[in-house]
């Protein structure tokens, strides 16, 4: 994707930042990095007894993976000086190990 800067975007633009498959390695590394070893993420037997039936990925990790996809997509190049936030972030479903997430960004203003 060609690098775009502020004036190159139009309200309503939807940018495809690609896909990534969540792996066991992602979950284990995230737990070690953050100290979040909650059993729903780490304990297969515990997770099997929950309404989800299996382990889930950490929600903040999914957000971080999405941010990584946006960064690697080339949108903005090296122009981003600071991360100023995300509005209306939605986690629409649980993410399991082996799931592939698709990342899109919509220009709102």
Language model features by range: what are they?
Residues 1-57:
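Catalytic strand-loop segment that frames the active site of acyl-thioester-processing enzymes
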Residues 48-57, 61-108:
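Hydrophobic beta-strand-centered segment that forms part of the acyl-chain substrate-binding groove
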């Amino acid at each position: 994707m060609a690098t775009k800067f502020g004036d190159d975007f139009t309200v309503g633009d939807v940018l495809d930042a690609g896909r990534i498959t969540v792996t066991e390695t992602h979950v284990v590394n995230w737990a070690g990095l953050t100290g979040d070893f909650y059993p729903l993420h780490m304990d297969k037997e515990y997770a099997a007894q929950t309404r989800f039936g299996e382990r889930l990925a950490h929600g903040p990790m999914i957000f971080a993976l999405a941010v990584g996809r946006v960064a690697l997509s080339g949108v903005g190049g090296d122009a981003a000086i600071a991360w100023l936030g995300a509005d209306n972030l939605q986690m629409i479903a649980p993410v399991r190990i082996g799931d592939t997430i698709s990342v899109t960004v919509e220009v709102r203003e």
